[in-house]
């Protein structure tokens, strides 16, 4: 019953009703739209699109000998008047804490200040890491970047000509684009995917699958933009 009440499922019902009562070319268009909508909502299309992008969560042992850890921002939210990391950011933060506890290294947190806010992503994420027992002396804040390209650009300025290898921690879907951009700036990294962030295939469509598919499409557009800028 709860699946039927999901907004994704309710909109599908509305489209089916529109198919029944529409005629001519409009009906053909709505039928095609309904099929595409269903394939996105049930997770099939998103799962197919995610195949070239996704990476399984990587064991932190891969970064046992890196010089430092780079944590990329994933947004912030305001809850009860207090700024905190977005839900999609916590897996990255926890992966960094896990990595640091096993292989203590300098941490660089990269994330600027969203429009209208007073604190940067980097500062807010750092607060969580401090609470997890990581000392302030081990954390460097990069507080200017607004996107992944700027993450790499400003971190390159911090590292200068450092040729050592760093552990790059980001989400599973963001993994590939981040690696491409950091390679573009000649920053040597071993990438760790903090989560397996993919659609869930269901019979009935749900809002979660639309959300994930939107993120996947965003990543494709970002990768296309990188290659176009190189032409």
Predicted regions and their residues:
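C-terminal terminal-structure detector
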Residues: 208, 212-231
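Membrane-water interface of alpha-helical transmembrane segments
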Residues: 2, 24-31
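Structural signal for the C-terminal ends of transmembrane alpha-helices
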Residues: 17-25, 41-43
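Hydrophobic membrane-insertion alpha-helices, especially the h-region
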Residues: 28-43
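Short helix-capping/hinge motifs at transmembrane helix termini and TM-loop junctions
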Residues: 22, 160, 229-230
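A structural signal for short, hydrophobic/glycine-enriched beta-strand patches
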Residues: 43-210
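Membrane-embedded alpha-helical segments of integral membrane proteins
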Residues: 1-21, 217
């Amino acid at each position: 019953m709860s699946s039927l009440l999901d907004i994704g499922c309710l909109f599908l019902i509305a489209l089916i009703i529109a198919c029944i009562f529409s005629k001519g070319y409009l009906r053909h268009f709505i039928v095609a739209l309904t099929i595409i909508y269903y394939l996105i909502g049930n997770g099939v299309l998103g799962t197919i699109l995610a195949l070239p992008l996704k990476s399984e969560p990587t064991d932190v042992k891969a970064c046992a000998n890196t010089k430092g850890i780079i944590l990329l921002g994933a947004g912030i939210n305001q809850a009860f008047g207090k700024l905190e990391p977005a839900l999609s950011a916590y897996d990255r933060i926890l992966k960094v804490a896990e990595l640091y506890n096993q292989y203590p290294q300098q941490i660089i947190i990269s994330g600027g200040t969203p429009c209208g806010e007073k604190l940067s992503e980097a500062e807010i994420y750092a607060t969580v890491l401090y609470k997890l027992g990581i000392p302030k002396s081990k954390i460097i804040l990069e507080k200017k970047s607004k996107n992944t390209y700027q993450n790499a650009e400003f971190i390159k300025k911090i590292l200068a000509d450092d040729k050592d290898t760093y552990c790059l921690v980001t989400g599973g879907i963001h993994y590939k684009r981040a690696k491409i951009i950091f390679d573009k700036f000649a920053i040597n990294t071993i990438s760790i995917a903090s989560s397996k962030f993919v659609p869930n295939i269901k019979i009935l469509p749900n809002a979660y699958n639309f959300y994930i598919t939107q993120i996947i499409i965003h990543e494709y557009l970002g990768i296309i933009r990188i290659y176009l800028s190189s032409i």
